Amino acid sequence: MPMKLLKLHLFFVFAGLIAVSCVNSDNKALLVGDWKGAEWLAEGKPSGNDASKVQFSFAGDGGYTSDFGGAKEKGTYILRNDKLYTTPDGQLEIMVEVAKLTKDSLVFNMNRSGQSETLTLLKQ
């Protein structure tokens, strides 16, 4: 491969990596803060779970806390593309799909025991 072509190829590889890393950091900046549940659906219908009792707090340093109606946990998180990976202290990693993330809303798509669930949270 001629040197000029190699340089051009490397340029596009690095430009792509920078673009992906900027998107991930933009999304992480949107995620940081306090979130409260607004709606919890199972198979597109009300789940019977009280979404207002769900709270998350994501810190810029990769730490998080959550409260599911009194069941509290804390740990670390990684946001990668459209997936949020949380690892509660002393437990295994959990992954949820981030269907939507804006400055004021966060939507998780989850699968519990084969049942599709959607949890919508609003930034506090």
Predicted features along the sequence, with ranges:
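Sec-dependent bacterial lipoprotein signal peptides
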Residues: M1-S21
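Lipid interaction determinants
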Residues: V20-K74, R80-Q124
